[in-house]
Swiss-Prot record:
Gene3D superfamilies: 3.30.70.100, Calcium-transporting ATPase, cytoplasmic domain N, Calcium-transporting ATPase, cytoplasmic transduction domain A, Calcium-transporting ATPase, transmembrane domain, HAD superfamily/HAD-like. CDD domains: HMA, P-type_ATPase_Pb_Zn_Cd2-like. It comes from Shigella sonnei (strain Ss046). It is a multi-pass membrane protein. Has two high-affinity metal-binding sites, one in the N-terminal region and another in the transmembrane region. Both sites are able to access and bind metal ion independently of each other. The N-terminal metal-binding site is not strictly necessary for activity and metal selectivity, but is needed for maximal activity and may be involved in regulation. The metal-binding site in the transmembrane region is essential for activity of the pump. Residues 1-124, 168-179, 223-356, 405-685, 730-732 are cytoplasmic. The keyword Phosphoprotein applies. This is Zinc/cadmium/lead-transporting P-type ATPase. Zn(2+) 1 binds at D58, C59, C62. Changing D714N: Lack of ATPase activity and strong decrease in zinc binding. Its main location: membrane. One of its GO terms (cellular component) is plasma membrane. Confers resistance to zinc, cadmium and lead. Couples the hydrolysis of ATP with the export of zinc, cadmium or lead.
Length: 732
């Protein structure tokens, strides 16, 4: 058992292409299923956090059984099983690892260290031996009954007992661990009851169908987890590190920021890296959904899991172990399971009432007719047992999480990361979208188009001063000014006391003097008023360079519209989703972009103004806010759902409920379509699960169906629900 690690802060959840340290807090539950196993420790009110990988789970109901087993232990504050990644997470006041492992084992499952290699799969024959044995015994029993009825009955009893033994043993384990109404318990009671009333053939058939259903559910669950498994497989196990001019093969966990690695043509990056080679093409489709290889130049960042298409490349490692793009997406998947949709929480609560209620109905059906109306005991005991099997909530329990997990996985394949079912549900309801302009509707790489200095200062001096203040800033306009100075090979002085003025600009001390870079209109500039008006009317953005309250000049910049912006807006309109631009830019520059796209706009907004605008719009209909900067974060928080562009700042990415990693606006359209398809899928699944139960409830009471058909209906509903959810993965 490995020693717990100490962690202290939380990594941005959407910074899929930024090198950041991954941290686990006891308040940050990972919930999806790719478990790390060595228990991890966090110092906060929730005590210590431990995590393991769980083996033996076939469906979401299994995850709940493990949770129930651990929840009964003293000292446990919180427990959650992330089915998609097969991970158990426990927050406890003290070290209870041994007790947790014992409790899970008693419930019929096993735990292993998170860093341990996956257990080798059992052979097909060994895995299916109980099912094969039961099928053979059933065939023999049927044959014997045809020739000798008493011997056939004895054979069916023997078959039932052989099939019942492992199921009843598991039922007892689950009862001891707190799962009183598990399907194993219902099956055991039904099979024993069927033997009691002489329905030996049906008792055996019930168990056979149950085992077949378990195998089908296991297969469906593995298919649902394939997306996560494929993502985990993107990272190679080893990397080639260059040290002192020599190559060495090392495990990827030993890589640290600053290490230099080589990746051969066709090889995958083991960590996020900065390209040191002159240029190269990378296939990033597994992470972003971008099918065309991406060209990268020296200094560009490349995410872990990307494939070098055509040449040997050298990179500098940027990410810590466990903090690469792939790790952060897996972390997101885990967190997504914690942020369950309201409908999922409702179904979970309903299913907890549903099974005991059906059992009570079954008991009444068994007792009332014989006691009050002198009906046949055998007939009504049989009907009561059949109702017991109808009471299994498996299909209902997985109806929502199966669809949501598939929807989230399908979105991730297309480069859209969504923070869980709650965000997915909100996204499906969106009927209007508010866009930031710079970096969202535009490429976010503006260029300097004009420099107009005041009398007594040259263009190069003005640009140098502006670049000194803007150096290190993340805003696209700031980067454009610095880039222009670098291209002109100007010597940029070091600025001190740099401070961002949210919604206004940025200021710093340069050569002992206060210099402010701000938007036109944020500071008086009468001498340049006519020129500013002319430039803004042409759709350009103008910034002022102010030193000690004196305007030294203006710099004009212009961005280009994203290539797919017009198409995305048109497709959103076709979905009945209206768009509006909310920007801090000047009204004339905003009007130029809005005119090209046919959108309404509000310009010159401070962050608080954006929040007010979003709040007002959100009152009329659910609104999504799409942005990429620090000034967009408050508005994203105020919207029904915030969506960040993948190239955005860490603040925007953390605040957002979803992100487009590939920076294509058409991904927003696909995201909304997928969210709506997921909701339709959930409704279909609930209809299938409850509809089949309702039909067989009626037919059972009318005496039209019996035990084995009830099991078939339960198994069939579970398989149908899972298969229907998997359709989302094939959606294009």
């Amino acid at each position: 058992m490995s020693t717990p690690d100490n962690h202290g802060k939380k990594a941005p959840q959407f910074a899929a292409f930024k090198p950041l340290t991954t941290v686990q807090n006891a308040n940050d539950c990972c919930c999806d299923g790719a478990c790390s196993s060595s228990p991890t420790l966090s110092e906060n009110v929730s005590g210590t956090r431990y995590s393991w990988k769980v083996s033996g789970m076939d469906c979401a109901a299994c995850a709940r059984k493990v949770e129930n087993a651990v929840r009964q232990l003293a000292g446990v504050n919180q427990v959650q099983v992330l089915f998609a990644t097969e991970k158990l997470v426990v927050d406890a006041d003290n070290d209870i690892r041994a007790q947790v492992e014992s409790a899970v084992q008693k419930a019929g499952y096993s735990l292993r260290d998170e860093q341990a290699a996956d257990e080798p799969q059992a052979s097909r024959l060994k895995e299916n031996l109980p099912l094969i044995t039961l099928i053979v015994m059933m065939a023999i029993s049927w044959g014997l009954e045809q020739f000798n009825h008493p011997f056939g009955q004895l054979a069916f009893i023997a078959t039932t007992l052989v099939g019942l033994y492992p199921i009843a043993r598991q039922a007892l384990r689950l009862i001891k661990s707190g799962s009183y109404f598990a399907i194993e318990t219902l099956m055991s009671v039904a099979a024993i009851g069927a033997l009691f009333i002489g329905a030996t053939a049906e008792a055996a058939m019930v168990l056979l169908l149950f085992l077949i259903g378990e195998r089908l559910e296991g297969w469906a669950a593995s298919r649902a987890r394939q997306g996560v498994s494929a993502l985990m497989a993107l990272k190679p196990e080893t990397a080639t590190r260059l040290r002192n001019g020599e190559r060495e093969e090392v495990a990827i966990n030993s890589l640290r920021p600053g290490d230099v690695i080589e990746v051969a043509a066709g090889g995958r990056l083991p960590a996020d890296g900065k390209l040191l080679s002159p240029f190269a093409s990378f296939d990033e489709s597994a992470l972003t959904g971008e099918s065309i290889p991406v060209e990268r130049a020296t200094g560009d960042k490349v995410p872990a899991g990307a494939t070098s298409v055509d040449r040997l490349v050298t990179l500098e490692v940027l990410s810590e172990p466990g903090a690469s793009a792939i790790d952060r997406i897996l972390k997101l998947i885990e967190e997504a399971e914690e942020r369950r949709a309201p409908i999922e929480r409702f179904i979970d609560r309903f299913s907890r009432i549903y099974t005991p209620a059906i059992m009570a109905v079954a008991l009444l059906v068994t007792l009332v007719p014989p006691l009050l109306f002198a009906a046949s005991w055998q007939e009504w005991i049989y009907k009561g047992l059949t109702l017991l099997l109808i009471g299994c909530p498996c299909a209902l329990v997985i109806s929502t999480p199966a669809a949501i997990t598939s929807g989230l996985a399908a979105a991730a394949r297309r480069g859209a990361l969504i923070k869980g079912g709650a965000a997915l549900e909100q996204l499906g309801r969106v009927t209007q979208v508010a866009f930031d302009k710079t970096g969202t509707l535009t490429v976010g790489k503006p260029r300097v188009t004009a420099i107009h200095p005041a009398t007594g200062i040259s263009e190069s001096e003005l640009l140098t001063l502006a670049a000194a203040v803007e150096q290190g800033a993340t805003h696209p306009l700031a980067q454009a000014i610095v880039r222009e100075a670098q291209v002109a090979e100007l010597a940029i002085p070091t600025a001190e006391s740099q401070r961002a003025l949210v919604g206004s600009g940025i200021e710093a001390q340069v050569n002992g003097e206060r210099v402010l870079i701000c938007a036109a209109g944020k500071h008086p500039a009468d001498a340049f008023a006519g020129l500013i008006n002319e430039l803004e009317s042409a759709g350009q953005t103008v910034v002022l360079v102010v030193r000690n309250d004196d305007v030294l000049g203006i710099i004009a910049l212009q961005d280009t519209l994203r290539a797919d912006a017009a198409t995305a807006i048109s497709e959103l309109n076709a979905l009945g989703v209206k768009g509006v631009i909310l920007t801090g830019d000047n009204p004339r520059a905003a009007a130029a972009i809005a005119g090209e796209l046919g959108l309404e706009f509000k310009a010159g907004l401070l962050p608080e103004d954006k929040v007010k605008a979003v709040t007002k719009l959100n009152q009329h209909a659910p609104l999504a806010m799409v942005g990429d900067g620090i000034n967009d974060a408050p508005a994203m928080k105020a919207a029904a759902i915030g969506i960040a562009m993948g190239s955005g700042t860490d603040v925007a990415l953390e605040t957002a409920d979803a992100a487009l990693t590939h920076n294509h606006l058409r991904g927003l359209v696909q995201m909304i379509e997928l969210a709506r398809a997921t909701h339709a899928n959930i409704r279909q699944n609930i209809t299938i699960a409850l509809g089949l139960k309702g039909i067989f409830l009626v037919t059972t009471l009318l005496g039209m169906t019996g035990l084995w058909l009830a099991v078939l209906a339960d198994t069939g509903a579970t398989v149908l629900v899972t298969a229907n959810a998997l359709r989302l993965l094939r959606r294009r």
